[in-house]
């Protein structure tokens, strides 16, 4: 046998093969890192820009075993794989459905039944003991995690670790588990920024929830108590911190990553798969809309067209310079403030999303001068204040929240939300999809959710009237806007394009 793959622990497998084959495998499991050209280590010749997932100790992330078969097929090798690696949970769909039917699950005071795609995700995860469960925002990922955790505690000894991206989500996840009536507060220990005084005394709690920033600081022996690990919003999980957490969880048989939008790029995908196993995507956002599970979505892609004189001056600026100039335009910010007020005056709630604090504060001040019910949220606003604003939006009408992408694009859930205005045009697929997800949650006060995507059209027009090209030069924010429209088309979202002359 050319390659032998041995079980090492629940985080890694060990490769046994000849030296020349090992180097071929190491190349096969190496990928160019995203943005490596901009990394100082690459620029100074200290790194070749590649991420290598097979290390010199011949250890490969557990989830990548399936890729070894592809390697063998491509290069004509034969492999033996330790049977322990492919062990599955002995659970039939019939037994799973029977177990699920006996659970009494609630949302508030109303008894609920998990949706078909939630059931499929839980079953797929349990049987395989690891999976990336890729479901759209608003598909009820916290219920999926609660059911996975409940099954584990009923059938295994050991604790469950849930990693979330923000302190606000630590509290939200714990509250959701209790709301479903699948767990009591005493069974859940919050650690780090989201913890309360009571959490100190919950050392026997079987479920531990914390941010990766808190978890990564724990001593190595702390990780040995966990038999199941779930990483919520796992698209934020690339990098050394999460890899070191996964490596510490070498006794942990069940590992799940949950996300609504995985990062593109082979290196990213392979890192996810290595940590959590294969990707399982049971449902799309467009299917959820079709089935009436989330609010219908309309995207207004508004091209803000600038005068020719301005576009010529903008040409040749760096990306950062362009952002600074455009977000600093008084006329543009006044237009955004006017739009937000107009939406709020219809008794509908609107979020205005910004990236840079100076831009957010400028928009907030313009709205505040004309309208009372406006609030500002960014990383500098503490979690408690954010939660108060979340409650205000959930229970109020005609409220405007000027919010940073960093705080509100990931995980904060407000159902009573009608409009999202993208005041800063971002390139990141993840931020765009997560932000859209915030507006899709169903609420009795809305039949349609609207995203206002502002695209700064400062392309330079050709001097000759005979040329077929509309623009001879595209500015960065226009290019990013066109990319977002392509993303909407890929996701089968309903979008319209309009032009507004500034």
Curated annotation (Swiss-Prot):
Residues 335-501 form the Helicase C-terminal domain. The keyword ATP-binding applies. ATP binds at residues 135-142. Coiled coil: none annotated. Gene3D superfamilies: 3.30.780.20, P-loop containing nucleotide triphosphate hydrolases. It catalyses: Couples ATP hydrolysis with the unwinding of duplex DNA by translocating in the 3'-5' direction; ATP + H2O = ADP + phosphate + H(+). Residues 122-280 form the Helicase ATP-binding domain. Keywords: ATP-binding, DNA-binding, Helicase, Hydrolase, Isomerase, Late protein, Nucleotide-binding. Its cofactor is Mg(2+). Unwinding activity is strongly stimulated by single-stranded binding protein gp32, the ssDNA annealing activity is partially inhibited by gp32 and strongly inhibited by ATP-gamma-S. Another study did not find gp32 stimulation of helicase activity. Holliday junction (HJ) branch migration is inhibited by ATP-gamma-S. Its EC number is 5.6.2.4. InterPro entries: Helicase/UvrB_N (IPR006935), Helicase_ATP-bd (IPR014001), Helicase_C-like (IPR001650), Helicase_Restrict-Modif_Enz (IPR050742), P-loop_NTPase (IPR027417), UvsW_N (IPR049409), UvsW_N_sf (IPR049430). Plays important roles in recombination-dependent DNA repair and the reorganization of stalled replication forks during viral DNA synthesis. Active on in vivo-derived T4 DNA; viral DNA is highly modified by hydroxymethylation and glucosylation of cytosine residues. Helps process Holliday junction (HJ) intermediates to mature products by catalyzing branch migration. Probably able to catalyze replication fork regression. Unwinds HJ and Y-branched but not linear double-stranded (ds)DNA; unwinding requires ATP and Mg(2+). Probably interacts with UvsW.1. Interacts with gp32. This is ATP-dependent DNA helicase uvsW. It comes from Enterobacteria phage T4 (Bacteriophage T4). The lineage of its organism: Viruses, Duplodnaviria, Heunggongvirae, Uroviricota, Caudoviricetes.
């Amino acid at each position: 046998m050319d390659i032998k793959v041995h079980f090492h622990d629940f985080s890694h497998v060990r490769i046994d093969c000849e030296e020349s084959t090992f180097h071929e495998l190491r190349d096969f499991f190496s990928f160019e890192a995203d943005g490596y050209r901009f990394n100082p280590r690459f620029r100074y010749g200290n790194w070749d820009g590649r991420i290598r997932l097979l290390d010199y100790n011949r250890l490969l992330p557990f989830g990548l075993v399936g890729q070894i078969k592809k390697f063998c097929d491509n290069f004509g090798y034969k492999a033996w794989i330790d049977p322990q690696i492919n062990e599955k949970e002995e659970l039939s769909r019939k037994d799973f459905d029977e177990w699920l039917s006996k659970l009494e699950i609630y949302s508030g005071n109303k008894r609920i039944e998990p949706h078909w795609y939630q059931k499929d995700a839980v079953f797929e995860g349990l049987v395989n003991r690891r999976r990336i469960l890729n479901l759209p925002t608003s598909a009820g990922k916290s219920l999926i995690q609660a059911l996975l955790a409940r099954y584990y505690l009923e059938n295994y000894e050991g604790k469950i670790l849930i990693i979330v991206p923000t302190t606000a989500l630590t509290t939200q996840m714990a509250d959701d588990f209790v709301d479903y009536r699948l767990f009591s507060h005493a069974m859940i220990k919050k650690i780090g920024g989201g913890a309360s005084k009571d959490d100190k005394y919950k050392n026997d709690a079987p479920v531990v929830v914390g941010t990766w920033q808190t978890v990564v600081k724990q001593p190595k022996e702390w990780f040995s108590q966990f038999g199941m690990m779930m990483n919520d919003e796992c698209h934020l999980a690339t990098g050394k911190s999460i890899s070191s957490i996964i490596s510490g969880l070498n006794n942990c048989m069940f590992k799940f990553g949950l996300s609504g939008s995985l990062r593109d790029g082979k290196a990213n995908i392979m890192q996810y798969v290595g940590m959590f196993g294969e990707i399982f995507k049971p449902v799309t956002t467009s299917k959820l809309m079709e089935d009436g599970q989330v609010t219908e979505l309309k995207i207004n892609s508004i091209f803000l067209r600038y005068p020719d004189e301005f576009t010529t001056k903008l040409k040749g600026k760096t990306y950062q310079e362009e952002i600074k100039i455009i977000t600093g335009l008084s006329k543009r910010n006044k237009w955004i403030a006017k739009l937000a007020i107009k939406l709020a005056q219809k008794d509908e709630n609107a979020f205005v999303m910004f990236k840079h604090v100076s831009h957010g504060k400028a928009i907030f001040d313009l709205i505040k001068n004309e309208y009372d019910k406006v609030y500002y949220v960014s990383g500098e606003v503490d979690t408690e204040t954010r939660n108060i604003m979340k409650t205000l939006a959930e229970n109020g009408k005609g409220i405007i929240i000027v919010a940073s992408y960093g705080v509100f694009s990931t995980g904060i859930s407000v159902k009573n939300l009608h409009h999202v205005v993208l005041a800063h045009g971002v390139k990141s697929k993840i931020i765009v999809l997560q932000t859209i997800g915030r507006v899709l949650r169903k609420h009795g006060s809305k039949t349609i959710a609207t995203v206002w995507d502002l695209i700064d059209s400062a392309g330079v027009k050709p001097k000759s009237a005979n040329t077929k090209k509309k623009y001879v030069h595209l500015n960065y924010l226009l290019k990013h806007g066109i990319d977002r429209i392509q993303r909407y088309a890929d996701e089968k979202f309903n979008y319209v394009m309009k032009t507004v002359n500034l």
